[in-house]
Design a protein with these regions (language model features):
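Basic/polar, cationic surfaces and motifs that engage anionic cell-wall
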Residues: 2-24, 44, 134-139, 148-231
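N-terminal catalytic cores of peptidoglycan-degrading enzymes
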Residues: 1-134
């Protein structure tokens, strides 16, 4: 695998035929902005030192459709008449006007889709805190895995994650990998109880550690930030 082409200087992923990511693709999302550290200091400093893992399925428990892809690309229409007339699809209407994104999405079949270059800020973590720092979007890369908190993830998803995590760590000075639930406790639960953290630990390059303890979030600082946000 070529280190200089797998993730480019601009933070774009390129698939390699010999890897599970041969089916990788880039679907540009409109939902991103500049990382504030880079805006202030230019390209001289790279603040990205955290990877945040999530799960997602739309509707909940439905895999393989295009709803997640459309959500991140800003083309999700909750009023589409060609979607199933099923109560399970009704919650999608609450997503109307929601602007969210992620850097990467790993489908159940191992396919990897990138939406935002890693040098840019994707909108995946929301109100969050990691070890005293609020706004984790500022300094993290987000990876969404297609799944729920009720079923295990697939072997090929871990295989793809095993390719993707080291590639990101080569491009950015990543120190930690965490889950959304650990930076937004009480508000989020992903990547859920079926995510295999032990297996993930074996995928990490030297110098990168898991941060999966409740103390990794400064709850008081996060509560203050949430109170400010609600005013």
């Amino acid at each position: 695998m070529s280190e200089d082409t797998f993730i480019t200087q601009e933070g774009r992923l390129k698939g390699v035929p010999s890897s599970p990511l041969y089916s990788s693709s880039f679907h540009p999302s409109p939902y991103w902005d500049e990382r504030p550290q880079l805006t202030k200091s230019g390209a001289a400093g790279d603040p990205v030192d955290l990877i945040v893992l999530h799960f997602i399925s739309l509707p909940a428990g439905t895999f393989g459709g295009d709803a997640v892809d459309r959500l991140f690309m800003g083309t999700l229409d909750p009023d589409r008449r060609d979607w199933p007339q099923d109560p399970a699809w009704e919650p999608l209407k609450t997503l109307k006007g929601l602007h969210v994104s992620t850097h990467f999405f790993i489908r159940r079949n191992g396919e990897v889709i990138q939406y935002v270059p890693t040098v840019k800020r994707a909108w995946h973590a929301g109100l969050s805190n990691f070890r005293g720092r609020n706004a984790c979007n500022d300094f993290s890369v987000g990876i969404e895995l297609e799944g729920t908190g009720e079923v295990p993830f697939t072997a090929v998803q871990y295989q793809a994650l095993g390719e993707l995590l080291p590639a990101i760590c080569r491009r950015h000075p990543v120190k930690w990998v965490t889950g959304h639930k650990f930076i937004a406790p009480g508000r989020k639960s992903d990547p859920g109880p079926f995510f295999d953290w032990g297996r993930t630990a074996q995928l990490l390059p030297a110098g990168v550690a898991l941060a999966i303890d409740e103390t990794d979030c400064d709850r008081e600082a996060l509560a203050r930030r949430m109170a400010e946000h609600s005013n």
